[in-house]
A protein has these predicted regions:
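Low-complexity, small/polar and acidic-rich linker and loop segments
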Residues: 2-187, 201-203, 208, 213-215
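Short linear interaction motifs
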Residues: 166-169, 184, 199, 268-275, ...
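Short linear, low-complexity motifs centered on an aromatic residue
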Residues: 195-210, 445-459, 654-662, 760-769
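N-terminal leader/propeptide segments of preproteins
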Residues: 243-344, 556-559, 566-567
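Hydrophobic, often aromatic-rich secondary-structure segments at membrane interfaces
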Residues: 305-428, 432-705, 709
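Small-residue (glycine/alanine-rich) low-complexity segments and short Gly/Pro motifs
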Residues: 656-775
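Hydrophobic alpha-helical segments
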Residues: 757-820
Length: 820
């Protein structure tokens, strides 16, 4: 009866509440009172009513704020829905399936659908990296020094000290890098809040607290809780005095949240210590008072002591022990999440499902059975895969205790070791990128020879009197504003050849090391800088024109990325002359959304010229969720093929596209001739690096041309394999499975034959095969400038020791098959 009277009192005070909401509110008030009473002795609360009033006042303030946020998010959702409905009506019915998936990832090749979550997140990420670089330089630390400092795992301790007590590390570089990290995060935080998040600023925050799910899971809840408890600031973490038993119970809940918490479409609260995630999947609406009450009982936050060592010690034991890696991953995940919110509102997956339903309804209402059939469950499944890819969830590995945990990680380790062994010659193979860059630049209007020269000049560094490389001074400022030439900060360089696969952990550091010592980081950044600045200069030279007066080729390219006449006016207003040439300083544009859109255009174009796999090619190359035998076998088969897939989808497709009607033959001729020229150059340098004589063109014209096209075109690393499969005689005992299956699968087949060799007492061949496999998985074994010396001083001697007479047989075989 007393409860009913209380409910009636609540209803009288707030007549708009239902009985259920009144009961929830009453339960919350009772919980507040009980909590204060239970801690009365410790808190020395003499005025219980005053304490209750204060707690309720704080609760009401939180509720009002949440209601305001929900109202704002509802308005954002309305705007997003309206924009989609308008676009759906304007899009021809046959184009609807393409248009819908292009919201997630723009189409490759010649297409009008390029603006997407992916292009937006790339633009955001490039802007965040530019903020980081420029803030470091303003603080007196050159970017190459700062990046090197960040990439050194041991320097994480100094960064933690700077966060806890600025200046305490007594390391000027650490101080500058920490401030730059905070500035980059702050830019992304503001953009996230603009589009539906509610992330508070914390001064000094450089990276969210990380938790290695596997490490935490391996420790019992009790062990983890007792290990972390001495490291915590108990006042900030628990909010009120608690007994040790209560603290351990609280931490046990946190342990469960970390180990079993389901990864969903989220924007992570990037408070350094906050575990809370804002659910982007739930539909908008007021959550009611009980939801906030439940939030009070959740595992909310862990605050470490600001002593310069507690957070560091926790990361070494249970978190990401590489602060630099955690920071770059955070920039990437935040850019992905904000990009998703900008296109789909605060609840991206919910909104995407709604868009899919509306598109299918239109097809059904118009009785278009063909389009309705295309929008089937298989289409929906692929769309969901694309969504996972562009929101950073596409390569999530199974957790400890889940099926496929060891299989997926073993697969990653094998691929990374293989990559670290093979990619030592990437810098030479990437000479072919000059050709693709020239083709793309020429396609939008840059004269063909000028396009080739501008990219070639980009490889002549300023240090030797050129105007290329990553650039410095004003030229570098322009490149930063365009969002190009900064991939080396992250794993973006190796992702050109690995997709987004196997980039973190399981030997990935070996791949990063190879990219660095071979100069591939520098070459990639230099080429993208050259492409971006060539494009900017070409457009800036036409700044006196109206958008409608631009050549059709460049205008349609810009329109595909969502660039409007208003955006073009903004670009014309920030034209700046550097070294006698006109460029755009995009960072001078006040409209941040326009700046992101324009950055997405420049970075997208650079990624299509210096081929970088995107979400579509990654989904094609990966296909399935990780951890199953089928998915891992497919992953191994597609290992190092993502570059070739991207070439086919981005470059080769332009020679067959209906959108290129009337220009397809000319495009194919340019692709073939350019591939042949730069492929011949790459294969010749590769032969010299191996200690071989260049192939005699007059005696092997057909083979040289075929080999050159394979090397300069999209075959990339697999140019050697295709040449081996079609142009050369395979090794004794090897078939198509070993050659075409890829490096890792080929090695598995080779090792699988060793027991048979031993059984047949062919010991020399068994030893030689085992040695060959081991060498092919040795990181750094193929570094181009050391290859000749390593072969003659080490590898050939080892092979000769295992198989006497091998060197002479090998030399005869190579000369017979290749004439070299």
């Amino acid at each position: 009866m007393a409860i009913e009277k209380c409910i009636q009192t609540v209803r009288k005070a707030m007549p708009d509440l239902s009985d259920e909401q009144a009961e929830e509110l009453l339960a919350e008030v009772v919980d507040i009172v009980d909590t204060i009473k239970s801690n009365n002795a410790e808190q020395k609360v003499t005025d219980l009513q005053g304490a209750v009033d204060e707690a309720i006042k704080s609760r009401v303030k939180d509720s009002v704020r949440e209601a305001a946020i929900l109202k704002r998010n509802a308005a954002i959702n309305y705007r997003v829905r309206l924009a989609f409905i308008t676009k759906l009506r304007e899009t021809p019915i046959k184009e609807v399936p393409r248009m819908l998936q292009a919201i997630l990832a723009g189409e490759m090749g010649k297409s009008q659908y390029k603006q997407s979550i992916e292009s937006t997140s790339r633009g955001l990420l490039s802007m965040a990296k530019a903020v980081f670089m420029q803030t470091m330089e303003k603080n007196g630390v050159p970017r190459n020094v700062g990046i090197g400092f960040l990439q050194n795992k041991k320097n994480g301790r100094y960064l933690v000290q700077e966060v806890d007590n600025p200046g305490s590390s007594r390391n000027a570089t650490a101080k500058a890098v920490a401030e730059a990290m905070e500035a980059a995060n702050e830019m992304l935080r503001k953009q996230a809040n603009k589009y539906g998040a509610d992330i508070g600023r914390i001064l000094g925050r450089i990276v969210k607290q990380s938790h290695d799910k596997t490490k935490v899971a391996r420790a019992s809840a009790e062990q983890w809780s007792r290990d972390i408890l001495p490291l915590l600031d108990k006042t900030k973490t628990f909010g009120r005095p608690m007994s040790e038993a209560a603290q351990l119970k609280f931490l046990a809940n946190v342990h469960q949240n970390i180990v079993f918490g389901k990864r969903i479409d989220t924007v992570i609260d990037i408070d350094t210590t906050n575990l809370k995630a804002k659910d982007l999947s739930a539909p908008p609406g007021f959550t009611g008072p009980a939801n906030m009450g439940k939030k009070l009982s959740r595992s909310r936050s862990l605050h470490f002591k600001q002593d310069g060592k507690s957070a560091w010690e926790y990361n070494q034991a249970y978190g990401n022990d590489h602060i630099g890696s955690a920071f770059t991953n955070q920039l990437l995940s935040m850019s992905d999440s904000v990009g998703a919110m900008m296109h789909l509102g605060p609840n991206p997956k919910h909104m995407l499902d709604e868009f899919y339903a509306k598109a299918r309804d239109r097809a059904i209402n118009e009785k278009n059975l063909d389009v309705a059939g295309q929008l089937d469950q298989a289409y929906k499944a692929k769309t969901d895969l694309l969504f996972d890819e562009v929101t950073g969830q596409g390569n999530v590995l199974p957790g400890l205790g889940q099926s496929g945990y060891y299989l997926a990680r073993g697969s990653n380790l094998a691929k990374n070791l293989s990559s670290a062994a093979l990619l030592g010659g990437t810098t030479i193979a990437s000479i072919g990128d000059i050709g693709t860059a020239a083709i793309r630049s020429n396609e939008i209007g840059v004269p063909f020879f000028e396009a080739n020269l501008s990219v070639l000049r980009g490889l002549i560094p300023e240090a030797v009197g050129g105007r290329g490389g990553r650039r410095t001074g004003e030229a570098r400022e322009i490149a930063d504003s365009l969002g190009v030439g900064m991939d080396a900060l992250m794993a973006s360089v190796q992702s050109r050849f690995l997709g987004n696969d196997a980039l973190d952990g399981q030997g990935s550091s070996a791949v990063s090391w190879v990219m660095r010592v071979t100069g591939m980081n520098w070459m990639n950044d230099s080429l993208k800088t050259a492409v971006g600045m060539t494009l900017s200069n070409y457009i800036a030279k036409q700044s006196g024109k109206k958008f409608s007066q631009l050549e059709t080729s460049i205008r349609t390219e810009m329109e595909a990325y969502g660039i409007t006449p208003e955006d073009f006016k903004l670009m014309n207003g920030v034209v700046r002359e550097v070294d006698g040439k006109k460029y755009h300083d995009i960072s001078a544009i006040d409209d941040l959304d326009a700046q992101i859109r324009i950055n997405g255009f420049f970075t997208g174009f650079a990624d299509s010229a210096i081929l970088t796999p995107g979400a579509r090619s990654n989904v094609f190359s990966r296909g399935l969720d990780r951890g199953t035998v089928k998915s891992e076998f497919f992953n191994l088969f597609m290992h190092l093929k993502s570059f070739s897939v991207t070439y086919g989808m981005e470059i080769l497709s332009r020679g067959f596209s209906k959108a290129n009607e009337g220009h397809r033959t000319g495009m194919l001729v340019k692709i073939v001739l350019t591939s042949m020229v730069y492929g011949y150059l790459a294969s010749t340098i590769k032969d010299l690096a191996k200690g071989k004589e260049p192939m005699d063109v007059s005696k092997n014209y057909g083979k040289v041309m075929f080999r050159s096209i394979m090397q300069g075109g999209g075959a990339g690393f697999y140019g050697d394999i295709i040449v081996g499969l079609l142009g050369d005689k395979p090794r004794r005992g090897e078939g198509a499975a070993e050659i075409a299956g890829g490096h890792v699968i080929g090695n598995l087949f080779r090792l699988g034959k060793v027991p048979q060799m031993l059984f047949s007492e062919d010991y020399d061949r068994a030893a030689s095969t085992t040695y060959r496999v081991a060498k092919s998985m040795l990181p750094g074994a193929n570094i181009f400038y050391a290859r000749w010396a390593l072969d003659y001083l080490l590898f050939w001697n080892m092979q000769e020791y295992i198989n006497p007479g091998w060197a002479r047989k090998h030399e005869r075989r190579v000369r017979k098959e290749t004439g070299q």
